[in-house]
């Protein structure tokens, strides 16, 4: 997988769709905010599970409305989210409304990169390109407890926002928003250096970054996600930003996952070139970008890196497959649930 990802990076260079090239290195199209139902018998690139009418909302203004109604919120989420852009877009929206907002960023409470590197060295296996050890660490280990617990809402501000990875660990008694991003988009962002490993100051090469994701970052972030799931009041799909940001209530998310776990469903596939790639998929699957030199990978059963789409009024909101396992793994696995659990 790492080798295939590296090959794809070499083939694709630093290009992509013109408007996306700066921050994602791929020629795969960004999943659409809205999509029409696929005709019967045609391969569906964006399979989605229906959650009912008017369940999914869109736009940075809608997110700002939700935050303004509550006054004090915690915004946690996954590694790979463009946190600076999210703060900037929300900040612009609140300034237009004349609101005084106090922002608290969790990254300032993280331990320094050298300390984290020493802590994680046993899990990462040095310079070996493939082998490491699944970490037993928890996300809390990345933070200085004194700094994390020092965040206090400003009583003079109209709105207080604690935002960033691990925000829920600070113990604020406030509604929790969780911002998710698909793992394929994380990797596309990684290839242009926009995504670094958790707590690191600078990016590694792509192969070592992915290895670090696999053995460390995604392990601890998934554990934290599982702990957050019952408390999430709003889930945000961040792969598109600005007016194409999508969100749904935590209650509708959990109900959708609950129903999905008792039904048939498909993950959203994604595609990449590779050393053994050919032209068959481009010729037989409508909607794929035909500018790629070949297609070798159809990531559809690789659920570690796949997402699940929910549909309402044509909107397609995506969350990672992990959410389904944390919510309903017994329904998904049946009699094998006690053996494999959420893994």
Identify the function of each model-found stretch:
Residues 182, 188-192, 199-221:
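Extended, regular secondary-structure scaffolds
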Residues 75-80, 163-166, 239:
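Structural motif
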Residues 3, 7-68, 85-89, 93-94, ...:
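NTP-dependent small-molecule kinase module
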Residues 15-61, 95-159:
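ATP-dependent small-molecule kinase phosphotransfer cores
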Residues 97, 149-199:
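ATP-dependent NMP and nucleoside kinases share a basic, alpha-helical "lid"
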Residues 333-342:
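Short, intrinsically disordered, charge-balanced linker/junction segments flanking boundaries
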Residues 69-73:
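Pre-Walker A (Motif I) flank of P-loop NTPase domains
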Residues 74-90:
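Glycine-rich phosphate-binding P-loop
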């Amino acid at each position: 997988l790492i080798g295939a990802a590296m090959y794809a990076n070499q083939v694709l260079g630093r290009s992509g769709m013109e408007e996306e090239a700066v921050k994602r290195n791929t020629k795969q199209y960004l999943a659409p905010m809205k999509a029409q139902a696929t005709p019967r018998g045609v391969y569906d690139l964006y399979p989605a599970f229906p959650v009912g009418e008017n369940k999914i909302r869109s736009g940075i203004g809608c997110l700002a409305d939700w935050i303004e109604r509550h006054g004090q919120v915690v915004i946690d989420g996954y590694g790979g989210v463009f946190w600076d852009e999210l703060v900037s877009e929300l900040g612009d929206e609140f300034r237009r409304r004349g609101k005084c907002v106090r922002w608290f960023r969790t990254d300032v409470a993280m331990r320094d990169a050298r300390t984290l590197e020493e802590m994680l060295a046993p899990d990462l296996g040095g310079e070996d390109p493939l082998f490491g050890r699944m970490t037993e660490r928890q996300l809390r280990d990345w933070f200085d407890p004194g700094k994390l617990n020092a965040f206090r809402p400003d009583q003079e501000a109209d709105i207080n926002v604690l935002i960033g990875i691990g925000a829920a660990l600070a113990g604020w008694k406030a509604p929790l928003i969780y911002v998710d991003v698909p793992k394929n988009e994380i990797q596309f962002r990684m290839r242009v250096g926009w995504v670094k490993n958790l707590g690191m100051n600078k990016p590694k090469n792509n192969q070592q970054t992915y290895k670090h994701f696999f053995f460390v970052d995604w392990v601890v972030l998934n554990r934290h996600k599982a702990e957050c799931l019952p408390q999430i009041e709003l889930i945000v799909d961040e792969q598109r930003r600005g007016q194409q940001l999508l969100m749904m209530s935590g209650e509708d998310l959990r109900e959708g996952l609950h129903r999905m776990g008792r039904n048939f469903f498909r993950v959203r596939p994604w595609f990449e070139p590779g050393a053994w790639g050919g032209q068959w998929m481009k010729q037989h699957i409508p909607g794929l970008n035909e500018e790629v030199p070949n297609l070798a990978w159809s990531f559809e059963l690789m659920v570690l890196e796949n997402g699940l789409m929910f549909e309402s009024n044509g909107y397609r909101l995506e969350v990672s497959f992990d959410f389904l396992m944390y919510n309903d793994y017994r329904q998904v696995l049946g009699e094998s649930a006690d053996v494999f659990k959420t893994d």
